[in-house]
Amino acid sequence: MTVYLVSRHQGAIDWIDHMGYGYDEHLTHLQDYAALATGDTVVGSLPINIVADLNALGVTYQHLSLYIPENLRGVELSAEQLSALNAEIETYQVKRLP
């Protein structure tokens, strides 16, 4: 079972490291699902359709969750800002409906 951190944001990577969340491999982008296996975990801020794909493969998805005020949208946040915004890692399970 491998834990993948998928993020291109240095602040998120620094925050996850600072908080002590362990991961095996860092990816800046999830190109395809070929390397993923049932029982793996992906941590990131991915679109819901990709989370549904991952869950259908038996991959656990953990989301870097936070509420970003309007004035910080589009801004590269630091680890300190993520902490101030009460960021947390939450596990989600998404199922695509017919």
Segments predicted by a language model, with ranges:
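Ser/Thr/Gly-rich flexible loops in soluble cytosolic domains mediating phosphotransfer, phosphorylation
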Residues: 60-98
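Short, well-ordered alpha-helical microsegments
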Residues: 12-13, 33, 50-52
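Short, charged N-terminal beta->alpha structural module
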Residues: 1-27
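Extended, well-folded catalytic/binding cores that form a central cleft or groove in large enzyme
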Residues: 47, 52-53, 61
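Short amphipathic alpha-helical segments
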Residues: 17-18, 54-57
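Short His-Asn-centered micro-motif
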Residues: 6-8, 40-46
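Flexible, charged surface loops at secondary-structure boundaries
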Residues: 1, 33-40
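Short, acidic/turn-prone active-site loops that include or flank metal/cofactor-
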Residues: 24-32, 48, 65-71
